[in-house]
Amino acid sequence: MAIILGVDPGSRITGYGVIQCQGRHQIYLGSGCIRTSSEELPGRLKQIFDGITEIIRQYQPDEFAIERVFMAKNADSALKLGQARGAAIVAATVANLPVAEYSATQIKSAVVGTGRAQKAQVQHMIQQLLKLPAAPQADAADALGVAVCHYHTSQSLIALSGRATARTYGRYR
């Protein structure tokens, strides 16, 4: 029964989503957004670090997954996004959580089935997968998508490793 914290980083709004995995089922535990104030970037990064630290304290996750930086048209935006990711990753590392990273395409593929899915499609599928009464806000849905992607990816790796170890002299046991 692993608890996974997924994070969709941003310098102004950082989404988070927490799920518990029981066998093939994913159970929604919580989600939301860390909204930083309009102060300078170092202060916003501290708010992200403190916010993720509090979420880790509250939910006690076993694993941490975060969306990778994509190449934005604006280099300054990409740098700020990278710094926001760094603040979240440091919070996870301080809590001794293993950190996994996924691209937006990987996340959308795991949740919707196509890497080119729109935000509304991700929100809808997260609502369906986690049996939520309403679609979560976009940043929280993206973070829940990161957690779901991590769960599916880790399950696939476990299945593959099981097959690899069951093989003896070119035959399956």
Curated annotation (Swiss-Prot):
Family assignment from sequence similarity: Belongs to the RuvC family.
UniProt entry keywords in alphabetical sequence: Cytoplasm, DNA damage, DNA recombination, DNA repair, DNA-binding, Endonuclease, Hydrolase, Magnesium, Metal-binding, Nuclease
Annotated Mg(2+) 1 binding sites: D8, D139
GO annotation, biological process: DNA recombination; DNA repair
Binding site residues for Mg(2+) 2: E67
Stored CDD domains: RuvC (cd16962)
Name under which the protein is recorded: Crossover junction endodeoxyribonuclease RuvC
InterPro entries referenced in this protein's UniProt entry, alphabetically: RNaseH-like_sf, RNaseH_sf, X-over_junc_endoDNase_Mg_BS, X-over_junc_endoDNase_RuvC
Superkingdom field: Bacteria
Keyword set includes Lipid metabolism: no
Entry cofactors: Mg(2+)
Organism of derivation: Shewanella baltica (strain OS155 / ATCC BAA-1091)
HAMAP family given in the database record: RuvC (MF_00034)
NCBIfam families: PRK00039.2-1 (NF000711), ruvC (TIGR00228)
Subcellular location: Cytoplasm
Catalytic activity: Endonucleolytic cleavage at a junction such as a reciprocal single-stranded crossover between two homologous DNA duplexes (Holliday junction)
Complexes and interactors: Homodimer which binds Holliday junction (HJ) DNA. The HJ becomes 2-fold symmetrical on binding to RuvC with unstacked arms; it has a different conformation from HJ DNA in complex with RuvA. In the full resolvosome a probable DNA-RuvA(4)-RuvB(12)-RuvC(2) complex forms which resolves the HJ.
